[in-house]
A protein has these predicted regions:
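N-terminal beta-strand motif that seeds the catalytic metal site of vicinal oxygen chelate
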Residues: 1-19, 47-48, 65-68, 117-121
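Vicinal oxygen chelate
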Residues: 5-13, 31, 58-121
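Conserved beta-strand positions that form and line the central face of beta-propeller blades
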Residues: 7, 40, 52, 92, ...
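Catalytic core of tubulin tyrosine ligase-like
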Residues: 22
Length: 121
């Protein structure tokens, strides 16, 4: 059976800003749950992993930067959207032989994420 990833969370100084950033780029649906100090994120699609964005309630060090890859059909178009929304491209495009290619970017708070385009079969 394995151990599939079933959820993700981003710790953020400004959850509303970060949620808006990802919603604009990927069309993710974000539901603000103020009673939980939490934003539930639905990524859509079959087999997608949903998650949440939260502002830590306690001061101190936050957990380490989390990196996950988001499947897209056009790396160049998403790079353009990321820049327009205030993000920065860190790795333009890199091939993974026999598998596909990826881009690494940071959101407005400097959190690194990846875009993934699988090789056409």
């Amino acid at each position: 059976m394995g151990n599939p990833v079933v959820h993700w969370e981003l710790m953020s100084k400004d959850p509303a800003k970060v949620a808006d950033f990802y919603a604009k780029i990927f069309g993710w649906k974000v539901q603000h749950r103020p009673e939980m100090n939490y934003r539930i994120v639905e990524t859509g699609g079959n087999g997608g992993i949903n998650g949440g964005i939260v502002k830590p309630e306690q001061a101190g060090p936050w957990p380490g930067n989390m990196l996950f890859y988001i499947a897209v059909d056009d790396l160049a178009a998403y790079r353009k959207n990321i820049i327009a929304a205030g993000g920065k491209i860190k790795i333009e495009e890199q091939k993974v032989p026999g598998m596909g290619k990826f881009t690494l970017f940071t959101d407005p708070e400097g959190r690194m994420m990846g875009l993934w385009k699988a090789k056409q079969k």
